[in-house]
Regions:
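Conserved metal-binding segment of the jelly-roll/cupin
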Residues: 48-61, 77
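Short histidine-centered beta-strand/loop micro-motifs
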Residues: 16-24, 64-67, 108, 162
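Short beta-strand His + acidic residue motifs that chelate non-heme Fe in jelly-roll/DSBH
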Residues: 38-40, 61-68
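Amphipathic, well-ordered alpha-helical segments in soluble domains
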Residues: 28, 115-122, 142, 146-149
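A hydrophobic/aromatic-rich effector-binding and dimerization subdomain
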Residues: 67-129
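Generic protein-terminus/edge-of-domain signal
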Residues: 1-52
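Short, Lys/Arg-enriched, Trp-marked, Pro/Gly-tolerant hinge/linker segments that flank
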Residues: 108, 130-138, 150-190, 194
Length: 198
């Protein structure tokens, strides 16, 4: 399938299309459609199968990807700055972000799987609509709907405690600082991204 490239949303056919050096500042989403895949994230090996949804907030923290011969997935890379520029009133993003740093895999129900597959397929299809006069805003709203679906799926699996607005802001700034430090270290070649978090 042809790759669709835009600086804010990118779809690839393989995990190799999303190399960490090309994807800094991007969040990687993988919806497994068939087969299986494994990878290492924070020294833990994860094995995913059909119906699993992976969100890697920082692609450089994952390695040792391997796919089964029948592996098929929707692989989407999102510009973090594009996502944060959208007017989300919910603060769930920071809760989900911290949780994903601990475990980036969500096991979906059949209904949630269909919903995510439809959302992502629609985004990929509309990404090709280059003549749309309000393309960026239209894609932003489609993406926003998908993100809110993901918040709902993730939140149903846990009972989050309310977090004050100031704490959310400080956590967001702290995470951004860690990513910047990680990028600087990886560019210098002296340290692995993992060492920044130790």
């Amino acid at each position: 399938m042809e790759q669709v490239i835009w600086d804010k949303i990118y779809f690839g056919d393989s995990i190799n299309d999303c190399a960490p050096q090309k994807q800094f500042g991007h969040i990687l989403h993988i919806l497994c459609m068939e087969g299986s895949m494994s990878f290492v994230f924070h020294d833990v090996r994860y094995n995913i199968a059909k119906g699993d949804y992976v969100i890697l907030p920082n692609r450089s923290l994952a390695c040792s990807f391997s796919e089964s011969s029948d592996f098929d997935a929707i692989i989407m890379s999102l510009s973090e700055s594009f996502v944060t520029s959208m007017a989300l009133r919910s603060n769930y993003g920071i809760i989900g972000h911290l949780s994903l740093l601990q475990n980036p895999v969500m096991r979906l129900s059949e209904n949630d799987f269909r919903k995510c597959r439809t959302d992502m397929s629609r985004l990929r299809e509309r990404l090709n609509d280059r003549e749309h006069l309000f393309r960026e805003e239209m894609l932003g709203h489609l993406l926003l709907a998908h993100i809110l679906d993901l918040y709902d799926i993730h939140a149903r699996g846990r009972k989050p405690e309310p977090i004050p607005e100031r704490a959310i802001s400080l956590l967001r700034q702290f995470i951004e600082m860690l990513y910047l430090i990680s990028k600087l270290y990886s560019m210098s070649g002296r340290h692995s991204a993992r060492s920044v978090y130790m």
